[in-house]
């Protein structure tokens, strides 16, 4: 079992999200659509997904060659975030997101 965690400041993402190239380099089309649809909290959603990518990378990259764009998230029908690696569901990885007004955190647990 491997664990990864990442914490990000939301303020930092307010600046980064002004750069469209950054968004397209880091997030999938589906992630951009999902986060952008959260008008009021879009920055939090982008930031927590970035933290999630970092947490997943830390949990599994010891044995795999991955880049940040290989990792993405989709919500299940129940709203739980699920991890996808290179477009395929990674059921061996659990992810948890949380955020407040200033900070986001993500924790990933891999059983592989």
Model-flagged regions — what are they?
Residues 1-112:
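Core catalytic alpha/beta fold that binds nucleotide/phospho-ligands
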């Amino acid at each position: 079992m491997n664990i990864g965690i990442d914490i990000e400041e939301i303020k930092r993402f307010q600046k980064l999200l002004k750069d469209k190239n950054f968004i397209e380099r880091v997030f999938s089309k589906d992630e951009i659509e999902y986060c952008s649809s959260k008008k009021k909290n879009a920055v939090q959603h982008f930031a927590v997904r970035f933290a999630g990518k970092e947490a997943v990378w830390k949990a599994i990259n010891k044995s795999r060659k991955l880049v940040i764009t290989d990792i993405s998230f989709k919500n299940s029908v129940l709203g739980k975030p699920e991890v996808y690696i290179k477009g395929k569901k990674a059921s061996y990885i659990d992810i948890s997101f949380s955020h407040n007004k200033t900070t986001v955190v993500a924790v990933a647990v891999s059983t592989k």
